Amino acid sequence: MSFTVIIPARFASSRLPGKPLADIKGKPMIQHVFEKALQSGASRVIIATDNENVADVAKSFGAEVCMTSVNHNSGTERLAEVVEKLAIPDNEIIVNIQGDEPLIPPVIVRQVADNLAKFNVNMASLAVKIHDAEELFNPNAVKVLTDKDGYVLYFSRSVIPYDRDQFMNLQDVQKVQLSDAYLRHIGIYAYRAGFIKQYVQWAPTQLENLEKLEQLRVLYNGERIHVELAKEVPAVGVDTAEDLEKVRAILAAN
């Protein structure tokens, strides 16, 4: 099965400016992400960036690069520009890997593409089980709730589902007994290329603005998203300088 990986790589990150070029074990971070994408078996890997320095570095290690606008409000808008510029066919499967995921397992890149191909949906993603109560109550850990067949009912930063008997008068998070219903969403997506173009035509919704989760726009507009349990749990992504040091330590130990 053929699929294309697009890696958005913004230079002007508010929390860690220039992070695509941050050195990790002698390579820029974006090169680590690119190499993981290649290992997934993708037929094509494209780095989408709004920065000439990132583009030059990416070309130096052999990556295909697509220059994009600096004015996009979301990563999905950047994907849509790439799809349009490169005339990618509407039925092509596109996997979106963030440019700050140097430790992403190649197996789950392939898995999310296979997930989309197996089901009659235009968008697919992955999740992992939540075993830690602190993670469950952490708003930075996005929760996802699905039906019995893996189709998404909702994404939220809140605890879903809400266990009324346990949580109503909860005083000690450590005493929570978690059921199998709790899933953390992993921010890797597969889409049909034509659907990406459709998505950016929809106006932002109240739900996504409240939760700050753009995937809610898809559900609001009546489209389905299928989620599977990831075959491998991805390690930390890089949002901050502290995250960068963690990733450096992990790779230095290997």
Swiss-Prot record:
Uppermost EC category: transferase
Location in the cell: Cytoplasm
GO BP terms in the entry: CMP-keto-3-deoxy-D-manno-octulosonic acid biosynthetic process; lipopolysaccharide biosynthetic process
GO cellular component, one term: cytosol
SUPFAM superfamilies: Nucleotide-diphospho-sugar transferases
Superkingdom to which the source organism belongs: Bacteria
Gene3D superfamilies, A to Z: Spore Coat Polysaccharide Biosynthesis Protein SpsA, Chain A (3.90.550.10)
Record has Transferase as a keyword: yes
Catalysed reaction, written as an equation: 3-deoxy-alpha-D-manno-oct-2-ulosonate + CTP = CMP-3-deoxy-beta-D-manno-octulosonate + diphosphate
Single GO term (MF): 3-deoxy-manno-octulosonate cytidylyltransferase activity
Pathways involved: Nucleotide-sugar biosynthesis; CMP-3-deoxy-D-manno-octulosonate biosynthesis; CMP-3-deoxy-D-manno-octulosonate from 3-deoxy-D-manno-octulosonate and CTP: step 1/1; Bacterial outer membrane biogenesis; lipopolysaccharide biosynthesis
Keyword tags: Cytoplasm, Lipopolysaccharide biosynthesis, Nucleotidyltransferase, Transferase
Family the UniProt entry places it in: Belongs to the KdsB family.
Its biological purpose: Activates KDO (a required 8-carbon sugar) for incorporation into bacterial lipopolysaccharide in Gram-negative bacteria.
NCBIfam families hit by this protein: kdsB (TIGR00466), PRK05450.1-3 (NF003950), PRK05450.1-5 (NF003952), PRK13368.1 (NF009905)
Protein name: 3-deoxy-manno-octulosonate cytidylyltransferase
Gene: kdsB
